[in-house]
């Protein structure tokens, strides 16, 4: 499937508390997948659309849940999409998230196994990869934890070949697909194979997505572990299909600026 590659916000949810009324005990808030679940002190549980209008108190400030929507991804559980408004002491508010490629300012909480919960926006790589079907709390049909595919997807979307920094540019078109059938190739005309991907970065690189940001020679020099796996002769989908570390693949436009 073909997508553009914006980068977006991801903020931690450490010390997350839902605003309670005077004299009320603070309710317990948890994250299940991409859904907030609130358990009140009387045992009542609120979740989904019932939390529209609630206010989250974070170290960064107060964030109001303005609305809640749902969508079904290509694979995995239902995704909850929240519109978050950051409120200030003067009573005004502003959107937490920048517009995604569809012009929507949405986000959701995310609980990755073994990591603190956080907020992510749909315009960023972390959020986009969840919506692609790579839900880090889920298993593939083959029993592989999708946490590995999600991290590989984040590397892919950001063109993070060595696992240390992204080299993409906002709005760059890419065609994402994988060996498990969660995302299928779009075969967009003019696109060519770019790389195969793992949770640690690229497994091989046929050519860089944005050559002005990093060249093949720079990739060879910066990432010795990719020696022998750089360039079109050394890196192709056919060769990588059998590589155990190659989970995701992508195509992009040669010479894209």
List where the protein language model places each region.
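N-terminal secretory signal peptides that target proteins for export/translocation
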Residues: 1-4
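Bacterial N-terminal signal peptides
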Residues: 8-19
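Long, compositionally biased low-complexity segments
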Residues: 30, 40, 52, 57-257
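Boundary at the C-terminal end of the N-terminal hydrophobic targeting segment
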Residues: 23-27
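Extended effector regions of multi-domain proteins
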Residues: 34-36
């Amino acid at each position: 499937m073909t997508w553009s590659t914006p980068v977006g916000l991801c903020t931690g949810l450490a010390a997350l508390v839902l605003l309670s009324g005077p004299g009320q005990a603070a309710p317990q808030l948890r994250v299940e997948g991409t859904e907030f679940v609130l358990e009140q002190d009387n045992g009542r549980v609120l979740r989904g659309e019932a939390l529209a209008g609630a206010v989250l108190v974070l170290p960064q400030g107060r964030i109001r849940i303005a609305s809640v929507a749902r969508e079904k991804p290509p694979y995995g559980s239902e995704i909850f999409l929240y519109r978050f408004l950051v409120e200030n002491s003067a009573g005004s508010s502003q959107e937490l998230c920048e517009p995604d490629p569809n012009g929507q300012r949405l986000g959701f909480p995310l609980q990755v196994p073994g990591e603190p919960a956080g907020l992510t926006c749909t315009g960023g790589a972390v959020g986009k990869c969840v919506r692609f079907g790579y839900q880090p709390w889920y298993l593939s049909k083959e029993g592989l934890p999708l946490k590995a595919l999600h991290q590989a997807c984040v590397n892919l979307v950001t063109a993070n070949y060595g696992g240390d920094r992204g080299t993409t540019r906002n709005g760059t078109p890419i065609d994402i697909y994988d060996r498990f059938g969660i995302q299928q190739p779009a075969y967009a005309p003019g696109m060519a194979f770019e790389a195969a991907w793992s949770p640690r970065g690229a497994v091989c690189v046929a050519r860089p997505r944005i050559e002005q940001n990093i060249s093949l020679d720079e990739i060879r020099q910066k990432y010795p572990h990719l020696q022998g796996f750089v360039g079109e002769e050394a890196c192709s989908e056919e060769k990588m299909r059998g590589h155990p570390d190659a989970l995701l693949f992508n195509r992009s436009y040669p010479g894209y600026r």
